[in-house]
Regions:
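The feature captures the beta-strand-to-loop junction immediately N-terminal to the Walker
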Residues: 35-37
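Helix-to-loop junction immediately C-terminal to a conserved catalytic motif
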Residues: 50
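Conserved ABC ATPase "signature" region
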Residues: 65-66, 113-132
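ABC ATPase NBD coupling module
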Residues: 67-83, 113
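Conserved ABC ATPase signature
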Residues: 136-140, 144
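Catalytic Walker B motif of ABC-type/P-loop ATPase nucleotide-binding domains
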Residues: 161-164
Length: 182
């Protein structure tokens, strides 16, 4: 059973072909790394899987759904079941670490605030930042901000988590925490 299937996929930015004839299958429950040089299309592939881009040709299927054929409401429903940690996973700068992680829970569920509180603290604890819940993003180091972004990505226990350059620019402690969680 495959969580993600990519079939004969092409993608171009205007006339510049980025991905040409890509096919791959990602099984459920496995960690899969897509590796390659700068500019070879790794981030583009993740954006295609998440439905942020549409292929020029071919098909992206996630959990049995052809992503490029989904209407907006169906695509949003699928994305709620995905966690994405992109290289520049920006946090909302005007709300606390706690509220950054709680955002998806408040936006996409009807959970009571007490349960959201417990879940947020559990996710922050998982990334080693339980004591940082009251801080604002401007008060965080780069590694701490990436760990908060990871806590946000895993907030709703997604079926699929996509990481883009998850270790770029991390200090040794953050690298160890994120590597262990992946």
């Amino acid at each position: 059973d495959h969580l993600v299937e990519i079939r004969d996929l092409d993608f171009a930015y205007e006339d510049r072909l980025i991905l040409d004839g890509i096919s791959l299958q990602i099984p459920r429950g496995k960690v899969v790394a897509i590796m390659g040089g700068s500019g070879c299309g790794k981030t583009t592939l993740l954006r295609l899987i998440g439905g942020q881009l549409r292929p020029s040709r071919g098909e992206v299927v996630v959990d049995g759904q052809a992503v490029q054929r989904l209407h907006n409401d169906e695509l949003y429903a699928l994305r709620r079941r995905m966690g994405m940690l992109f290289q520049f996973g920006a946090l909302f700068t005007d709300i606390s670490v706690f509220d950054n992680v709680a955002y998806q829970m408040r936006e996409h569920t009807n959970l009571p605030e007490e349960l959201i509180r417990d879940m947020v603290l559990m996710k922050l604890n998982a990334v080693g930042l339980r004591g940082a819940h009251h801080l604002m993003p401007a008060e965080l180091s780069g590694g701490m901000a990436r760990r908060v972004a990871l806590a946000r990505a895993i907030a709703l226990d997604p079926m699929l988590i996509m990481y883009d350059e998850p270790f770029a620019g991390l200090d040794p402690i953050s690298l160890g925490v994120i590597g262990h969680l992946i």
